[in-house]
UniProtKB/Swiss-Prot annotation:
Belongs to the insulin family. Brain peptide responsible for activation of prothoracic glands to produce ecdysone in insects. The lineage of its organism: Eukaryota, Metazoa, Ecdysozoa, Arthropoda, Hexapoda. It comes from Bombyx mori. One of its GO terms (biological process) is regulation of muscle cell differentiation. Silk worm has two kinds of PTTH: 4K-PTTH and 22K-PTTH; there are many forms of 4K-PTTH. Disulfide bonds join 30-76, 42-89, 75-80. This is Bombyxin B-4. Heterodimer of a B chain and an A chain linked by two disulfide bonds. Residues 1-20 form the signal peptide. Pfam families: Insulin (PF00049). The keyword Disulfide bond applies.
Length: 90
């Protein structure tokens, strides 16, 4: 009986660890580590030219919830996920 319970718990733990529903861990990325991580994540992502956007998109009301914060504010001063870092690619 004990062996069955241990095996069941082991299967549950492994399933949770491997599931896509697991939360991504937020970490801090600063300095060289931030630059290297961005370079690795953004490799091959096509960069967009700012010229394709009308100037009014750069006004404060169109900057969204990020405002003037940058990648250092979001990922060095506070922990962030890889999804946040990926949002700075391109």
């Amino acid at each position: 009986m004990m062996k069955t319970a241990v095996m069941f718990m082991l299967v549950v733990v492994i399933n949770l660890m491997c599931s896509g529903e697991a939360q991504e861990v937020a970490r801090t990325y600063c300095g060289r580590h931030l630059a290297d991580t961005l370079a690795d994540l953004c490799f091959g992502v096509e960069k967009r030219s700012g010229a394709q956007y009308a100037p009014y998109f750069w006004t404060r009301q169109y900057l969204g919830s990020r405002g003037k914060r940058g990648v250092v504010d979001e990922c060095c001063f506070r922990p962030c996920t890889l999804d946040v870092l990926l949002s700075y690619c391109g």
